[in-house]
């Protein structure tokens, strides 16, 4: 029987049959949103339940603030706008949507009878939701400040200039001097957000180095009372 030997094509010769052209590489979006590139990071803004604070709502939803949040890696902005703030919030949100330049997801609500703890914990990060540690931006109410300090989330305290007394300013200045909070100003909220990033690093050595064992033993309420002059 005649054997037929098939001659193998030398390995150095290229096949003449056309090979499929490679598919072009996928291009990343020019401006990826933080939501798509990083874990959640929340800024929670609260004006409290007793007094309106329209100026803080406007400042939080301004293009400068939203831009600063995006640059700092924030993915979410949650605004508690109070019982009289819905119309203002909706109007500001319409401007945000019209501009269409923010990558931050913005939501809001008036009041929550269950309290603000879950929103502060969302800003704290970690837990079941995961995510990075964010920040709380608050009016200078002592109760709200205490809640944020207990959760150990960085807090920016913004006094309301429309109130008749200056106790909020005094409280914000005293706590900022001791490195417990950032004293924020309405017209400079983006700067306060930058300062909060630095405060975050310093607070890893909580409590502040100048607090001392005796001040630490007084607890947060005792520290607030001491700073405001309410001594036993």
What are these regions (language model features)?
Residues 2-5, 10-16, 24-133:
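Donor-nucleotide binding loops and adjacent catalytic segments primarily
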Residues 3-5, 29, 197-232:
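C-terminal amphipathic helix plus adjacent low-complexity
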Residues 78, 107-109, 137, 156, ...:
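Hydrophobic/aromatic beta-strand patches that form the interior of the parallel beta-sheet core
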Residues 107-111, 180-192:
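Short acidic-hydrophobic, aromatic-tinged amphipathic segments that line or gate anion-handling sites
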Residues 120-164:
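A donor-sugar binding/catalytic signature common to diverse glycosyltransferases
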Residues 150, 160-183:
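Active-site-proximal loop->helix
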Residues 153-154, 174, 201:
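Acidic/polar active-site rim loop that often engages polyanionic ligands
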